[in-house]
């Protein structure tokens, strides 16, 4: 009987390494950090074991640890002392993210700062824009100028990449126009243009204190049941000028990661979100899985699906695994 002998290329660790199609590198990773304005806080987030809210005055040690491990891209999320109905803290000169960015760039000029450009962490209602008094929904067009102000403020503080996550229609076009008019032609936009209204975001909202005080985000984030809608969002953001595209969440949406990769030549970013992280951590802490092997398999699955970069709370752990 004649048959194919595929096992020839699996015969040893060296052989398997030689023919491996996808690899996870430190350069692929973007590490999220939650920064609070209050002094002397390093508080572990209960629903995100091993992830902390960190004060501005303690940020340097966290940045040094990440940098020394080989991480070269950071994404800051701010937890401000005060909030209002229009998210003023997102775009003021001395906002928590602006301060964190200046600290990071002063320490390491080659550390890329990816700015999460949204209002939900700064609004007292927890939504990603201005609320219409009549519909009690987010007013898309009134929110856009505030997002532009936020992006410009973040770049002025030293951000290298703008990553708008609010899912307002036209947000990429307006931010691109605003950045260009301000002279920031070379600042790329990493759009969260394929962002689903996912239940996997729960622990993040604990970490960033950004849960909506009423309703949900289903009128602006995507329905998890939809696949073709992702391609429509992608097409719009590409026309509007995005330079990179985020798919969020990642692990339950690997088909979407592959679809996006197949329909664009811009880099694709997978966001390994908080709920995905927490499930893995919980199973590992109970001894049900081998954390290192499962984490690396998850990362490889995202790369195999088409991700060029991965935003993950496991970034420091992955660097340690790769150093072994």
Curated annotation (Swiss-Prot):
Pathway: Porphyrin-containing compound metabolism; protoporphyrin-IX biosynthesis; coproporphyrinogen-III from 5-aminolevulinate: step 1/4. One of its GO terms (molecular function) is porphobilinogen synthase activity. SUPFAM superfamilies: Aldolase. SMART domains: ALAD (SM01004). Mg(2+) binds at residue 233. Its cofactor is Zn(2+). It holds the Pfam family ALAD. It is an enzyme of class 4 (lyase). Disulfide bonds: none annotated. Gene3D superfamilies: Aldolase class I (3.20.20.70). Its EC number is 4.2.1.24. The keyword Metal-binding applies. 5-aminolevulinate 1 binds at residues 205, 217. 5-aminolevulinate 2 binds at residues 274, 313. The keyword Magnesium applies. Keywords: Heme biosynthesis, Lyase, Magnesium, Metal-binding, Porphyrin biosynthesis, Zinc. Binds 1 zinc ion per monomer. It catalyses: 2 5-aminolevulinate = porphobilinogen + 2 H2O + H(+). Zn(2+) binds at residues 118, 120, 128. It comes from the Bacteria. One of its GO terms (cellular component) is cytosol. Catalyzes an early step in the biosynthesis of tetrapyrroles. Binds two molecules of 5-aminolevulinate per subunit, each at a distinct site, and catalyzes their condensation to form porphobilinogen. NCBIfam families: PRK09283.1 (NF006762). Belongs to the ALAD family. This is Delta-aminolevulinic acid dehydratase. It comes from Staphylococcus aureus (strain NCTC 8325 / PS 47).
